[in-house]
């Protein structure tokens, strides 16, 4: 059962969630390197995509709600940076669950397979060599 942010019922198989929506994938990628609050997720997505993807609050928080309900992300009970400015106490921080990390890895593997198939068919260019000759 894929095609949404999370499955309709609880599942321990990350594959059951695939394919993720672009919004869900962007949220999970934003959380892959640590906890973030909602606005931080929006900023990370905008920066990572060069401004091509901008998540509005309604879209973002709808996805967060569904991802939480599916056990993919969770709300953190503590602030990751106790030195943050006053007023940040109200911010809710989110993080990937262990299951959510598996979902993200499964989706990246699925997308990688699609890209490899497209390259075999000549539908997209081969990757550019990385600097340094690797």
Model-inferred region functions:
Residues 70-87, 95:
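Beta-hairpin "wing" of winged helix-turn-helix
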Residues 14-59:
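N-terminal helix-turn-helix DNA-binding core of bacterial DNA-binding proteins
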Residues 60-70:
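Basic amphipathic alpha-helical segments that dock to polyanions
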Residues 2-8, 99-134:
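Amphipathic alpha-helical dimerization/coiled-coil segments
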Residues 1-16, 81:
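N-terminal intrinsically disordered/low-complexity leader segments
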């Amino acid at each position: 059962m894929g095609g949404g942010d999370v499955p309709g019922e609880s599942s321990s198989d990350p594959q059951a969630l695939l394919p993720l929506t672009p919004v869900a994938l962007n949220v999970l990628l934003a959380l892959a390197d640590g906890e973030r609050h909602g606005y931080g997720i929006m900023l990370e997505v905008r920066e990572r995509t060069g401004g091509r993807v901008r998540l509005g609050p309604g879209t973002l928080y709808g996805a967060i709600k569904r991802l939480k309900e599916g056990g993919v992300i969770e709300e953190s009970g503590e602030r990751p940076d106790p030195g943050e400015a006053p007023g940040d106490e109200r911010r809710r921080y989110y993080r990937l669950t262990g299951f959510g990390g598996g979902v993200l890895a499964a989706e990246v593997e699925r997308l990688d397979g699609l890209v490899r198939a497209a390259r075999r068919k000549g539908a997209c260019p081969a990757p550019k060599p990385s600097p340094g000759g690797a």
